[in-house]
């Protein structure tokens, strides 16, 4: 390395890029037969930074330029999610407006558009998580699912709310620009409700305290995340992620919310306009669409958090017909998945309508909704999938209502058309 000062007897050295001599610059760094000065190094670094920033912006702009319309979003949701028409319509509009807002962020305007996060209310297995997953896949943005019940306030045992952003970064290879336009789905948000609608004087590390921590994340903050998933410790460089433009979708079953709504409506419905139906006759799916912010506060969510979730969509409990549709109609329907698994063995799978109905009824009895369909079907096909690789000449497996109810094993059809019961020799 050549210093600026030198004796007159020294050979004068020059930067190979700008041509300045060693006396005109602070430092001159030598390589194999070449030299570069500190000024050229600074210029190179500046060019690299500018080009990297420009490429990130171009990539983000390209990703936003093909934003689907609400109708297109709804049509895509229809391919994977059965029923819940009103919820899909609300989500399509909310997501379209959110990413349309991001598309115009760089433009100067007198009107500043606020972010509209989403709250999904519906029973277990009604499609809340699937809706959020499908939206993220359609929009090709980073997506993460967080379980609110595992979160605690900072400093307590459990997951810090900023771990959510860390997982989002992991899902996009730590590209901060991509993560800042992602979607976060927070499940079981109802499980962190405070125990009463009055502020508590005692510490509630997994309830109201977590709501307060989530509030900062949802409304927009600079989250500090350790690089490449490391643990937080002093004197460490953190990745700074701005959560202002991340779309947060919160979901929960909110068991008992319908009672809160009915109590309110019964107080205001006295007289000729009162509800004719009794409380027992009014189904939760009928009552939940009437949810007001005051009901959610009574349930245990803090007012500030409710204010940051202005878009509310309610999902209804799936009936037998809807569950039967879910088994066969979506792109990734369960019946199609198991048919493909058996086709890999060269065997056709036939599930008769009576069996589909029996699966749906069993899921309703278990109160698991669509989430419980796979376990019922898996249980019915377990013996067949275990024995099938050892059988020769099986052409078709037939599942009927008796198989689902456990009264008879699946029927195996052989090449010579001789039916055989699975498990028999």
Swiss-Prot record:
<dbReference type="InterPro" id="IPR004487">
    <property type="entry name" value="Clp_protease_ATP-bd_su_ClpX"/>
</dbReference>
<dbReference type="Pfam" id="PF07724">
    <property type="entry name" value="AAA_2"/>
</dbReference>
<feature type="binding site">
    <location>
        <position position="18"/>
    </location>
    <ligand>
        <name>Zn(2+)</name>
    </ligand>
</feature>
<comment type="subunit">
    <text>Component of the ClpX-ClpP complex. Forms a hexameric ring that, in the presence of ATP, binds to fourteen ClpP subunits assembled into a disk-like structure with a central cavity, resembling the structure of eukaryotic proteasomes.</text>
</comment>
<feature type="domain" description="ClpX-type ZB">
    <location>
        <begin position="3"/>
        <end position="56"/>
    </location>
</feature>
<dbReference type="Pfam" id="PF06689">
    <property type="entry name" value="zf-C4_ClpX"/>
</dbReference>
<dbReference type="GO" id="GO:0051082">
    <property type="term" value="F:unfolded protein binding"/>
</dbReference>
<dbReference type="GO" id="GO:0008270">
    <property type="term" value="F:zinc ion binding"/>
</dbReference>
<dbReference type="GO" id="GO:0005524">
    <property type="term" value="F:ATP binding"/>
</dbReference>
<feature type="binding site">
    <location>
        <position position="37"/>
    </location>
    <ligand>
        <name>Zn(2+)</name>
    </ligand>
</feature>
<keyword id="KW-0067">ATP-binding</keyword>
<dbReference type="InterPro" id="IPR003959">
    <property type="entry name" value="ATPase_AAA_core"/>
</dbReference>
<comment type="function">
    <text>ATP-dependent specificity component of the Clp protease. It directs the protease to specific substrates. Can perform chaperone functions in the absence of ClpP.</text>
</comment>
<dbReference type="GO" id="GO:0046983">
    <property type="term" value="F:protein dimerization activity"/>
</dbReference>
<dbReference type="GO" id="GO:0009376">
    <property type="term" value="C:HslUV protease complex"/>
</dbReference>
<dbReference type="InterPro" id="IPR010603">
    <property type="entry name" value="Znf_CppX_C4"/>
</dbReference>
<dbReference type="GO" id="GO:0051301">
    <property type="term" value="P:cell division"/>
</dbReference>
<feature type="binding site">
    <location>
        <position position="40"/>
    </location>
    <ligand>
        <name>Zn(2+)</name>
    </ligand>
</feature>
<dbReference type="GO" id="GO:0051603">
    <property type="term" value="P:proteolysis involved in protein catabolic process"/>
</dbReference>
<dbReference type="GO" id="GO:0016887">
    <property type="term" value="F:ATP hydrolysis activity"/>
</dbReference>
<dbReference type="GO" id="GO:0140662">
    <property type="term" value="F:ATP-dependent protein folding chaperone"/>
</dbReference>
<dbReference type="InterPro" id="IPR003593">
    <property type="entry name" value="AAA+_ATPase"/>
</dbReference>
<protein>
    <recommendedName>
        <fullName>ATP-dependent Clp protease ATP-binding subunit ClpX</fullName>
    </recommendedName>
</protein>
<keyword id="KW-0547">Nucleotide-binding</keyword>
<dbReference type="InterPro" id="IPR050052">
    <property type="entry name" value="ATP-dep_Clp_protease_ClpX"/>
</dbReference>
<dbReference type="Pfam" id="PF10431">
    <property type="entry name" value="ClpB_D2-small"/>
</dbReference>
<feature type="binding site">
    <location>
        <begin position="123"/>
        <end position="130"/>
    </location>
    <ligand>
        <name>ATP</name>
    </ligand>
</feature>
<feature type="binding site">
    <location>
        <position position="15"/>
    </location>
    <ligand>
        <name>Zn(2+)</name>
    </ligand>
</feature>
<keyword id="KW-0479">Metal-binding</keyword>
<comment type="similarity">
    <text>Belongs to the ClpX chaperone family.</text>
</comment>
<dbReference type="InterPro" id="IPR038366">
    <property type="entry name" value="Znf_CppX_C4_sf"/>
</dbReference>
<keyword id="KW-0143">Chaperone</keyword>
<keyword id="KW-0862">Zinc</keyword>
<dbReference type="InterPro" id="IPR027417">
    <property type="entry name" value="P-loop_NTPase"/>
</dbReference>
<dbReference type="InterPro" id="IPR046425">
    <property type="entry name" value="ClpX_bact"/>
</dbReference>
<dbReference type="InterPro" id="IPR019489">
    <property type="entry name" value="Clp_ATPase_C"/>
</dbReference>
């Amino acid at each position: 390395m050549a210093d600026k000062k030198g004796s007159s007897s020294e050979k004068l050295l020059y930067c190979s890029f700008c041509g300045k001599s060693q006396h005109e610059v602070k430092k001159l760094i030598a390589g194999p037969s070449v030299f570069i000065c500190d000024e050229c190094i600074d210029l190179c670094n500046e060019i690299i930074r500018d080009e990297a920033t420009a490429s990130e912006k171009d990539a983000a702009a390209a990703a936003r330029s093909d934003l689907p319309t609400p109708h297109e979003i709804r049509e895509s949701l229809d391919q994977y999610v059965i029923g819940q028409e009103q919820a899909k319509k609300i989500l399509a509009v909310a997501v379209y407006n959110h990413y349309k807002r991001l598309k115009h962020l760089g433009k100067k305007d007198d009107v500043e558009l606020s972010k509209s996060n989403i709250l999904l209310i519906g029973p277990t297995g009604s499609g809340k998580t699937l809706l959020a997953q499908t939206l993220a896949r359609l929009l090709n943005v980073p997506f993460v699912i967080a379980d609110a019940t595992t979160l605690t306030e900072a400093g307590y045992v459990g997951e810090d709310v900023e771990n959510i952003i860390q997982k989002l970064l992991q899902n996009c290879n730590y590209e901060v620009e991509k993560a800042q336009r992602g979607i976060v789905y927070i499940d079981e948000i109802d499980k962190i409700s405070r125990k009463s609608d009055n502020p508590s004087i005692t510490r509630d590390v997994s309830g109201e305290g977590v709501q307060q921590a989530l509030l900062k994340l949802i409304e927009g903050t600079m989250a500090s995340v350790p690089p490449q998933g490391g643990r937080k410790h002093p004197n460490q460089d953190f990745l700074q992620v701005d959560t202002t433009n991340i779309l947060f979708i919160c979901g929960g079953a909110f068991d008992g919310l319908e009672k809160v709504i009915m109590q309110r409506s019964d107080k205001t419905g006295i007289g000729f306009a009162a509800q004719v139906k009794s409380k027992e006759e009014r189904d939760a799916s009928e009552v939940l669409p009437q949810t007001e912010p005051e009901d959610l506060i009574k349930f245990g969510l803090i007012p500030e958090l409710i204010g940051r979730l202005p878009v509310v969509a309610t999902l209804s409990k799936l009936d037998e017909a809807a569950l039967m549709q879910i088994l066969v109609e979506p792109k990734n329907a369960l019946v199609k998945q198991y048919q493909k698994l058996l086709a890999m063995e060269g065997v056709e799978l036939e599930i008769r309508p009576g069996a589909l109905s029996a699966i749906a009824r069993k899921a309703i009895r278990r109160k698991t909704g669509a989430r419980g369909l796979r376990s019922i079907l898996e249980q019915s096909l377990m013996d067949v999938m275990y024995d099938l690789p050892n059988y020769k000449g099986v052409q078709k497996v037939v599942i009927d209502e008796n198989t689902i109810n456990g009264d008879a094993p699946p029927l195996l059809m052989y090449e010579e058309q001789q039916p055989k019961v699975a498990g028999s020799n």
